[in-house]
Amino acid sequence: MTDLKTIIEEAYQNKDSFTTDTVPKKIHQAIHQTIELLDNGELRIAEKQNGQWNTNEWAKMAILLYFKTEPLKTFDAGYTFFYDKIPLKYTNNTSQPQSGVRVVPHAIVRKGAYLAPNTVLMPSYINIGAYVDSGTLIDTWATVGSCAQIGKNVHLSGGAGIGGVLEPLQAHPTIIEDDCFIGARSEIVEGVMVEKGSVISMGVFVGQSTPIYNRQTQEITYGRIPAGSVVIPGSLPSKDGHYNRYSAIIVKQVDEKTRSKVSLNELLREG
């Protein structure tokens, strides 16, 4: 994989020197090999090592090169046609899902996204570079953006959106860690991290500029929901006191033992 990384990095530095028609065979093969590694889960855009998430920038480079070098193609969906550069993940009988993966009709998964065993997709959308770990449910009309990392046993409720982050290369993708619940119509975007075991209420919107207020500590932070947080939508007064600004409110933090004994509705109502 080291050789592949070197080829991709060098190609990205010289990306203006070739087009779809003139891309060297060596680079073309390296791009496709990288996409295959992402597709089967052998490579991830981001990985947690020693408690820290690290981004594989070269894998992002490969995706951007994939967009640049692939020609537009016609995809026959039976009842209509689509025109795109990136094929879908399950395009024929030889590309079968992992054990226990359920893909309900009208769910769409792009090539280069990985679905671990025992994941369930209701009609939803998973973009290239995304990683969805085992036991996770992606509910109806939920979307998982490019390069987003979704942990084990996560529930993305109906209409929830997890934003994609391809550029800048050094930016972390949006990350939802293990055992999280993301409420209906909530949006977690711009590389925000929701740590393990957190519960996000319905209709919570969190980007990098969204204030995250911890009711217990009275701290305001940005870009990260701490482990075990129970979060609801709210607002904070502006500095001049003339208006209120939308905020995400951490009403409490619970451990795994409490989470296992108390229903999600109870946790949110107690807030």
Swiss-Prot record:
Gene3D superfamilies: Hexapeptide repeat proteins, Tetrahydrodipicolinate-N-succinyltransferase, N-terminal domain. It is found in: Cytoplasm. The keyword Cytoplasm applies. It is an enzyme of class 2 (transferase). GO terms for molecular function: 2,3,4,5-tetrahydropyridine-2,6-dicarboxylate N-succinyltransferase activity. InterPro entries: DapD_Trfase_Hexpep_rpt_fam, Hexapep, THP_succinylTrfase_dom1, THP_succinylTrfase_N_sf, Trans_hexapeptide_repeat, Trimer_LpxA-like_sf. GO terms for biological process: diaminopimelate biosynthetic process; lysine biosynthetic process via diaminopimelate. Keywords: Acyltransferase, Amino-acid biosynthesis, Cytoplasm, Diaminopimelate biosynthesis, Lysine biosynthesis, Repeat, Transferase. Pathway: Amino-acid biosynthesis; L-lysine biosynthesis via DAP pathway; LL-2,6-diaminopimelate from (S)-tetrahydrodipicolinate (succinylase route): step 1/3. GO terms for cellular component: cytoplasm. Substrate binds at residues 102, 139. Its EC number is 2.3.1.117. It catalyses: (S)-2,3,4,5-tetrahydrodipicolinate + succinyl-CoA + H2O = (S)-2-succinylamino-6-oxoheptanedioate + CoA. Homotrimer. Belongs to the transferase hexapeptide repeat family. This is 2,3,4,5-tetrahydropyridine-2,6-dicarboxylate N-succinyltransferase. The lineage of its organism: Bacteria, Pseudomonadati, Pseudomonadota, Gammaproteobacteria, Legionellales.
